[in-house]
Amino acid sequence: MENNLQVNIFCIQKSDEFKTWSEKYSKLISKYATLKEINVFNKKIALAQNLNAIEAKKSYEEAFMPYKKGYCIALDEKGKDLTSIEFAKLIQDKNELSFFIGGAYGLREEFNQSLDFRLSLSKLTLAHQFVKTLLLEQIYRAFCINNNHPYHK
């Protein structure tokens, strides 16, 4: 199978506590697409998070701006709820997908609105580290749906 699709995941995160699970799904996704995971965390974000939510969200946005390319999706609890089949349709036939996972304070409304789509994985507030792992599983599931693989039953 030819891997023409580029999938990018950008996350405000120091380290990956769910590394074993992330690696599992990253390997599975590689059968369908080239995957790039970038944990974005710098001194400005660390300082801003200690100031307030507004400054933190601004620092997240500044860190993410250079990566806005392809079909851009924000992970946001106020985003649209999709079934796995609907998500598979959403990402089907795209050349490049870029997913943005904010830090502890989420993302600014203006940033979310500047992207192509806002996706909610749950109405619950989830740890951003966990969101990334859950997103990887759903991306793999979507590829399986789109390729008639039995993983999704």
Swiss-Prot record:
A cellular component term, taken from the record's GO annotations: cytoplasm
Keyword terms of this UniProt record: Cytoplasm, Methyltransferase, rRNA processing, S-adenosyl-L-methionine, Transferase
Domain of life where this protein originates: Bacteria
InterPro entries: Alpha/beta_knot_MTases, RlmH-like, tRNA_m1G_MTases_N
Residues the record lists as binding S-adenosyl-L-methionine: 75, 102, 121-126
UniProt-annotated location(s): Cytoplasm
Primary location group: cytoplasm
Pfam family, one: SPOUT_MTase
GO molecular function: rRNA (pseudouridine-N3-)-methyltransferase activity
Reactions the enzyme catalyzes: pseudouridine(1915) in 23S rRNA + S-adenosyl-L-methionine = N(3)-methylpseudouridine(1915) in 23S rRNA + S-adenosyl-L-homocysteine + H(+)
EC number: 2.1.1.177
Annotated family: Belongs to the RNA methyltransferase RlmH family.
Function: Specifically methylates the pseudouridine at position 1915 (m3Psi1915) in 23S rRNA.
Subunit structure as annotated in this protein's UniProt entry: Homodimer.
Protein known as: Ribosomal RNA large subunit methyltransferase H
The species this protein was found in: Campylobacter jejuni (strain RM1221)
